[in-house]
Design a protein with these regions (language model features):
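Conserved loop-to-helix interface motifs that mediate assembly, gating, or partner/ligand docking
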Residues: 2-171
Length: 171
């Protein structure tokens, strides 16, 4: 009887310890989320200014559709940029993003996927792991962008996507 009591107490202690660890992890993830939200808020003025500048350029360009980025072309090679977190401490966010990406591939880009003309740029470890396990063509050059998130890092990613489109690697 006393052995069972000791075992129950040990289990209770173990559960309490796990609860403490979980609470600490929640606090750490909340702090990181807040830091990421602050970084995004700080980038908003840059993004709106960039959007304004691009609008001015397109509207001031004679026949604006002559620009490489504005030209319409048949979709042959697809680039899908999937942004997930590095860890699973964000509720259903990663699962929802992955489901949405899979649904988009199935509904819009099934032919490109079947012919091997679909590439996924995975930003965040969870998305990279998810799509690699399922055999998708995953480019992980920006997978660790959240390790040191900055405007410069995001800018490099955006420039790479624009350059790939301009060079007609992707449509």
């Amino acid at each position: 009887m006393s052995g069972q009591l000791k075992e129950v107490r040990l289990r209770i202690k173990s559960v309490q310890s796990t609860q403490q660890i979980t609470k600490a992890m929640k606090m750490v993830s909340a702090a990181k989320l807040r830091r990421a939200q602050d970084a995004i808020i700080q980038m908003r003025p840059y993004a709106s200014k960039l959007q304004e500048m691009l609008s001015n350029i397109v509207s001031n360009t004679e026949g604006g559709s002559n620009m490489t980025l504005a030209e319409e072309r048949q979709v042959k090679n697809v680039l899908m940029i999937v942004i997930t977190s590095d860890r699973g401490l964000c509720g259903a966010y990663n699962a929802n993003i992955q489901k949405m990406a899979l649904a988009t591939i199935k509904e819009k880009y099934a032919a490109q996927y079947a012919s091997g003309n679909l590439t996924i740029w995975a930003i965040g470890k969870k998305g990279a792991e998810f799509f690699q396990k399922r055999g998708y063509n995953v480019d992980v050059r920006f997978k660790d962008i959240f390790m040191k998130l900055s405007f410069g890092a995001v800018q490099l990613c955006a420039q790479a996507a624009v350059q790939a489109f301009a060079q007609k690697e992707f449509d």
